[in-house]
Regions:
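Topology signature of small-to-medium multi-pass alpha-helical membrane proteins
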Residues: 1-138
Length: 138
């Protein structure tokens, strides 16, 4: 389970970097910055998210319980909300958060998050947080 979550974090971080390089306007709109190039703000945003991902990676590697539960809840709830939000954005009901490819990518990430969250829940029932039999529920 740890490797799946770490893999997702790696893909998420690489995606953030790729979006910054290819379509930095997405960062600008997420941070509600005026039109123009804001490289320092974008790099600060990437740095803050990178620090959060790094902390979560350390927590996964050390099998910290709080990171298990935080990741589980974020993946189940966040992922479940991303999917219908993306559908509503594509249907024109909600204003789009970016180009169509970005909205579709968000929906795909939501689907992957929910799937990983369900796998984490099943692993918890079987062998405890992070598939650690010592911490398995009795």
């Amino acid at each position: 389970m740890q490797s799946i979550v770490l893999g997702f974090f790696a893909v998420a971080w690489l995606s953030l970097v790729a979006i910054l390089v290819v379509e930095p306007e997405i960062y600008d709109s997420a941070m509600k910055l005026p039109a123009g190039r804001h490289i320092l703000a974008e790099l600060a945003f990437l740095g803050a998210i990178s620090a959060l991902i790094a902390l979560l990676v350390v927590g996964v590697l050390r099998r910290w319980r709080w990171t298990f539960w935080l990741t589980l809840v974020a993946f189940l709830i966040g992922g479940a909300l991303r999917i219908p939000a993306s559908v509503l954005e594509l249907a024109g009901v909600l204003p789009p958060a970016g180009p169509a490819w970005y909205v579709l990518f968000q929906a795909l990430l939501g689907l992957v998050q929910v799937t990983i969250g369900l796998l984490m829940l099943a692993g918890y029932r079987r062998a405890g947080p992070w598939d650690n039999p010592v911490d398995a529920p009795r």
